[in-house]
Amino acid sequence: MHLRHLFSPRLRGSLLLGSLLVASSFSTLAAEDMLRKAVGKGAYEMAWSQQENALWLATSQSRKLDKGGVVYRLDPVTLEITQAIHNDLKPFGATINAATQTLWFGNTINSAVTAIDAKTGDVKGRLVLDARKRTEEVRPLQPRELVADAATNTIYISGVGKESAIWVVDGETIKLKTTIENTGKMSTGLALDSKAQRLYTTNADGEFITIDTASNKILSRKKLLDDGKEHFFINLSLDTAGHRAFITDSKATEVLVVDTRNGNILAKIAAPASLAVLYNPTRNEAYVTHRQAGQVSVIDAKTYNVVKTFDTPTYPNSLALSADGKTLYVSVKQKSTREQEATQPDDVIRIAL
C-alpha cells in the first residue's frame, strides 16, 4: 500500500553541484572531529543506512504552526539535506530494517507508526497502535522506542503509559501481530538481541525485563537497585557478544552496566543524568547523551571509565552510528517551552571517532 498523497515530493537539488561540493570538502570534513549543522525544529531520533549511505532525522517541527512533521534525509558526510519527506503526523522515534530498507517512525501523539521506503521516500503504510480516544480517564499508550528484527521482519515498539506495553508489528503486512502487556510504568527503553531471540525493556519502576521473542512472553523482570531512590531507566543499548546492557537513568548520576543473562549489575559509571545510549562494538565504547548537562560522554567499555566528553549544547537528544563504527551522530535540541518555542532549528552533529 502506498500513501504517497500524505507526503510532498522530495527536495531536488543539483546532483552535480552536490557531488562537487562533497568531493572538494570531504578531506577537510574528515579531518575535523566535529561538524554541526542546523536541520529543522523538533529534532528527535535518527536512522542510518549503509546501503543508501544516508542518515534520516525525524522532526516534529513547530508545536503551534505545523500540524505534521518532516523526515529529513541527510548526506552523512556534509549533513546537508538531500530530501524532505513531509508527514501529516509528527514523527519522533526512528529505526530501520536494514534487510528490507524500510524506515519506521513512531507517531507518538497519534499512537501510530509509519513505514517509509528508504530508497524512494514513498510511504509503505501506517498502523494505529492504540485507537482509544484521549479523555480525562483514558490515556492511549504512546509509541516511544522502535527496534527492527531483520531476521523475521518484525518491528517492536514500546507503548508508554502508566501501565506500558510492547507492540509487535509484522513488517511485511504492517499489521499488529500481538501485544506484550504489563511492562511497567513508562517502559521506554527497548533493545533486541535477534540471534538470542531476546528483547529487553526498562522502565520507571526501576526494572530490567527480559522477553522471549519466539513466544512474546516475559521471561523475567528484575528491580535493578533497591536503594530507596527514584530511578527511571529510560534507554538501553546492548553488547550482544559480551551479554551486557548499558542502561541510562534520567533520575540518577550514573550509567548502569547489566549482565543480560541474569540482570546482575556489572558496573556503575559516574556520569550526569542521562538520556540516550549507544554501544559501539567496533571500538568497544558506549556513547551517552546528557540532556541537562549539554554533553555527550564516551565510555571505555573495558574499563568503564569516561574517557572523553563532547560539549553539545543546548540539549543533546538521540544517537546514531555509522555501520563501520567510525562516525557518531547526535541530534541536538534548542531550548524550547510550550510558552516560548525555539526560534532556531535543531541541529545534527557528526563526530569522527
From Swiss-Prot:
Record has Zinc as a keyword: no
Signal peptide: 1-30
Name of the molecule in the record: Uncharacterized protein YncE
Keyword vocabulary terms for this entry: Signal
InterPro entries registered for this protein in UniProt: Haem_d1_sf, Host-pathogen_enzymatic-act, WD40/YVTN_repeat-like_dom_sf, YNCE-like_beta-prop
Organism from which the protein derives: Salmonella typhi
Phylogenetic placement of the source organism: Bacteria, Pseudomonadati, Pseudomonadota, Gammaproteobacteria, Enterobacterales
